[in-house]
């Protein structure tokens, strides 16, 4: 065939000159020989005539020069496409391929190279079978991607710092709520003590010092109890409260009997009686109220003590009855706030009893003692009206303060749990899948061409470098995370695997694969190999799947092939929503 073409060109020098002008610069003799054959077979009327050209033919050629030039350029393009397909393995749209193959019929190319297409490569891999991930850990090649390591290390540092700032902000919120509740309780106590001090203008200097000391001790105890136990406030059970009331009953009875005996036997002046009664009252109050304020459910214990309605009823009943000493003891055991009212509003009460009861720490007791100091010039009926009105006022104030304290305390205890649950509350939707899928469709094509360039998927290929290069070609980054195997609670552990490292690969917040090895490079190589196996299928799909993370199941975006089902996925090394 080549001899026939050379003989034809030697006989027609004009055709030979015309064809030689169509040769490209740098085109090899082998390529040009076959492409010249293609041009001559399909030139037709485009080639000049073999003999001497006449004037008439030249004029006709000039008239049709525009059409001839277009046809000539099309013929040259077809010849170049055919040569690229034969010698370089290029492929074109189906219409173009059919056209150039039909034009090249009869041309025999004996020394053309052979190329493997992507579809043929995938078919070969399927026939050969894909090795499982449970095989021995293979040694990676010497090439390492330094940029990937640096970027993953920087991202891990950013994740750690963000977690620390979130914890610090949560602690600041808890401390601020504790301080706010303590300030509210102190303001309530100060308001009550200021109202009492306005009525207590006629009392002695000793009584004022005792009342100021009691109010300051109450505020300090409230602040310590609020700040120490605010986050762990729990309601005490009924059995514990019953045993506590029995202890109070015994302590109050003992102190009341001692005080009555001392008043009967002592003939000392009023000043010594005042000092003794104040000391005994301070001891009884410290024994009664310190455990109440130190308990975890302080707000719920104070609620029945300060704002209970039976306090006013027992106070009014104590006025009408003359057996007031026994009734005052029993009522003070049931409700601490009513003890002073029943004992102070009784007729013929001594001044020592009034001053001793001034040292109690509840506001209703102090108000009742002030009423008792004024009872010398008033009747028992007027005392009943004043005591009931003051008791109702103290009940309203105590109710408002106790309600605010009880509403604050459970909110503090649940603040940490609500923050931890809201922290990762956003759920993945199909919109997230639709946003990620186009990128991985492009990545599938890029990885396929990279595999064709290196001769297909094989153990000799640096899988990590190939995957990273394909992702960087699409202007994205490969996220790499490392965790020691012993820190994973969702994997079985034995002595041989204690020192292993687990690697997880992600891209665009989508999970690609997990690998385990004795070093970070080894683990990354295994994870990259598992990720590349997905791209050997016909199609890759982004799906929302369940994965384990620290003992619980979470949702994650996972890259899978079209046929596989998400069963027994490896546990997540980090929470996916931390990385979004």
Curated annotation (Swiss-Prot):
The modification N-acetylalanine is found at residue 2. Residues 168-179, 248-269 have a biased composition (Polar residues). Residues 155-167, 231-240 have a biased composition (Basic and acidic residues). The modification Phosphoserine is found at residues 131, 241, 389. Its main location: nucleus. PROSITE patterns: DS_RBD, XTBD. There is a cross-link at residue 184 (Glycyl lysine isopeptide (Lys-Gly) (interchain with G-Cter in SUMO1)). It is found in: Nucleus, Nucleoplasm. This is CDKN2A-interacting protein. It comes from Homo sapiens (Human).
